[in-house]
Amino acid sequence: TQETLSEVQERRRQFMADASHEMRTPLTTINGLLEGLQYNAIPENQKENAIKLMQNETARLIRLVNENLDYEKIRTNQIQIVVKKFNGTEALENIVTQLTAKAEAAGNQLYLDTTEPIDVYADYDRFVQVVVNIVQNAIQFTENGEIHIALEKGYLETIVRISDTGIGMTEEQILNIWDRYYKVDPSRKNTKYGESGLGLPIVQQLVRLHKGKINVESELGKGTTFIISFPDVEITEN
């Protein structure tokens, strides 16, 4: 309908504005700090922090660019999935180590509820990308709460559960989160945890390339759980 088309166009316009802002902000920060270092405007005892901030902003830019590149690769069927068996628990331990500081910066506690080794059949790098993206979303929309990751065996599949005690979503929001241009809470787009909005559509497509499934359970004001299943089979998917 015309109304639906108008909504999509407005989401696209807002997405482009957000993406431009999210690219410009780290570039401006990096440029300002470089000028400060060049002209010795940053005190000696603050230079280390300035360098760390530039590294963080550079990583943020790389992530934004990679998300856009991945989305285009998926859209044009140029991405390859090579599924192998690996220790999923160990992979999740590494993710928790990687993201704990970010979670704690938002007042959150990040837990891995699985201790026994459990094998996963997946493309290792894409598995990590899927889990990291969802955990980062949980951090973004949770304050002074908890985020739990669990791994379990199902029937001919391995299941990852990622739950948080964050703001939650309505049924309408759950239906829309896979839209490339949709944001669950536009009012939070300028927080220091803001992302480009491409993450969940990429996650959904990567899970589909694994012949897996992704489901969401959420209650407004109480939190969200993502349930991702990976079949126990080795495949190569173009």
Feature locations, PLM:
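Short conserved segment of the HATPase_c
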Residues: 169-183
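Short helix-loop "hinge" at the ATP-lid/N-box region of the Bergerat-fold HATPase_c
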Residues: 138-139
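Short acidic helix/loop segment immediately C-terminal to the autophosphorylated histidine
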Residues: 38-45
